[in-house]
């Protein structure tokens, strides 16, 4: 068994906030992240398995790149996450929620 990591990069913006909290409570919870701000993200996709003896490959990297591009990068790159991606309506655009969303995109 081996683990193959493929790294992808994208840029996106977001802001935190909870409409159910007061301005004071939002500021206490999220600080300056209440303001729209951006990040340069790095997504690492890890594939675990055995090398195919016929090809010498664990995975078709071209196919992996296409799946990530079509299902994740096209939606998230240069977006404002909580506005442009419907899944985030009513959810914080946190790194943790981004991972959940990305997994759902690839697994579906």
What are these regions (language model features)?
Residues 1-108:
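Charge-rich, low-complexity N-terminal segments
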